[in-house]
Amino acid sequence: ATGTLQNKDDVLNSTKKRRLKKAKKSSKPIFIVTPDEAYDNELEKSSDYKTWSFKADNVRDFAWASSRKFIWDAAGFKQDSIENPLVMAMSFYPNEGEPLWSKYSTEAVMHTMAVYSKYSFDYPYPTAQSVNGPVGGMEYPMITFNGPRTELEDDGSRTYSRSEKEFLIGVVIHEIGHIYFPMIVNSDERQWTWMDEGLNTFLQYLAEQEWDINFRSDRGEPRWITDYM
C-alpha cells in the first residue's frame, strides 16, 4: 500500500517480522512470504479479519492491494541521502508470475531508483513497491501495478521468453519512474504531458540501457523522433 505499515505486530507473525528485518539489511531480495507459503495460503481461506494501518506523508493519492495468493519479497535500497538513506523495495505477486517475478521485479525497482536518482533527485519515500495486478502498468505514490506473468507449459512448469522478461523489467522501470514524474513533483500530467511521459520515457530509456546495453527498448532512441519531424 501507499505508506509505511504502522501495526506490523498485529498483522505479521514472528517469522515474517524476522524476515522483514533481515531484508532491510540485504541488497538482494529476501522472501517475506515464500512461494510455498503463498500456495498454502491460496488453498486455505481465512475467516479472520485484520486491519492493516499505513501512514504516508506528502502524497496526493493512495492505493493498496491484497491477496492470499501473494508471494512477498523485499530488499533494502541504500541511497546517498541524508533525509532518506534507506528505501524498502518490495514486490507482491502470485505463483503464476514465477520464476520471472522473484528474479527481476524488486531488482528492477532498485535499479530504477538508482538511475533516476542519479539523473534527477533522490527518492524521498520510505517504500517502493511493484505489484502484479490486472493492468499493463499503473502508478500511485510508493506503489505500482504491473501486468506480465509467465506461461504455463504442458508439464506444469512455468517459463518466460526474452520479450516477456524485458516487458516486466521495462514496465517496472516505467511505473516506478512515474512515482518520480508526476507523483513526487506533483505536476498535472494531463496538462503538462512532457513533464510526465516525456521525462519518464527519457529516463526509462537510460535505465533500460544501463540494465543491459542490448535491452530492446521500444521508446527513447533519439533517432526515432524523425518520424514526427
Predicted feature locations:
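Hydrophobic helix-coil surface modules that form long, contiguous segments used
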Residues: 1-173, 202
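Zinc-dependent metallopeptidase catalytic helix centered on the HExxH motif
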Residues: 110, 114, 160-228
